[in-house]
Amino acid sequence: MSKKSLRQVLLEADRCVVAPCVYDCASARAVEMVGFPAMMLSGGEVSVAMNGVIDYGFSNLTDIEWITSRISQTSGIPLAADIEDGFGGPLAVYRAAKRMAAAGAKALQLEDAGDMEDSTTLLPREKYYEKVRAALAALEGADCFLIARTNADPATELDEGVERCRMAVELGAQMTTVVKLGNLRDATYVAERVPGWKMYPDVGGSNGVPEVSVEDIYPLGFNFLTMHYTLKAAMDGMLEHGKANFAQQGSLYTCDKVDATGIMGMSASPLFDPHGYMELEASFGGKRKEYTIVGHEVEGFPEGFVRTPIRDRL
C-alpha cells in the first residue's frame, strides 16, 4: 500500500503528476515499475478486463471496489479511481464514496453523465451538485479527495462545463476536470475561469506530436494528467506473441524474445519479485527458501526498474 496519499504526492510535486490508467494489479505493477508516481483506475478498462464487456454502463460498485482494494493493497503508489456517475442518486454516491475510500482509493472521479449508455447527455446542474455534496460528505475525514468531472463538450458546451467545475470547487471539490479537453486553447480557457487543482484527462496526440505537454499545462493549474496505454499495450503484446506462437504451435517465440526487462522464458513471475517475498518470510525467523515454479528456478527482479519493498505490497 502506498505510503503517500495522492494529495501528498501532488503537494510535494513541482510539476504536473502524470498518472496512467490501470485496470488490474498487473497493469498497476507495470506503471509502478517504470517510475510513475500515481495511477488512475479506468472504469471502462475494468469493464473490458474484468467482465469482458464494453464500457456501456455494465460495471457496478462491487466490481470497482473489489479491484480497487486489490490494486491499492499491492501497490506502492496512490490510486485515483473513476466511479462513473456514482452508481445512482445522491445516497448511492455517498455509499460508493465511503466504500471506495475504505478500499484504498486516494481520489474519486465523479461525472455528470445523465445516462451511462450515452455519456454525452448531462445531468441537470442541480442534480449533479447533489451528487457532489453527497461525495464530499462521504469523504470528510478520509485521505481521499473528489475530482468533479463534467462531460460537457468543449466544442459546444465549454461555458457549461466551466460553470459546473466552478460550482463544484465552490462546494468543496479539490480537483475538477473537463473530460473532453483536447487542446491547449480550451485548457487555457478553463484555467482562466476555474480555480483550484485541475486534471487534464486522457492526453493523446498524433504523428509524433502530443496535444499538450506537461510544461504547457502545469502553469495553468493542471497538476494531474491521465493517459491510456496499458490495456492497448497488453493486448498488443498478447496478440503479437499469440500470432507467432499459434503459427509455431508452441511458445518458442515468447521464450526466445528479449523484452524490455531482459528476462527470458515464458513467465512474468520475476516482475513481481518473488524472491523479495522469500526474504520477508525469512526475516520472521524461518529458513530462507528458494522460490521456484514446479521446481524451476525463477530469475531475480530485473535491473533498471523501480523495486517497491514487499512490506509495502502486502
Regions found by a protein language model. Name each.
Residues M1-S2, G250:
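Intrinsic low-complexity, intrinsically disordered segments enriched in polar/basic residues
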Residues T230-L314:
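Extended, intrinsically disordered, low-complexity segments
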Residues S2-T226, Y277-R313:
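Alpha/beta enzyme core
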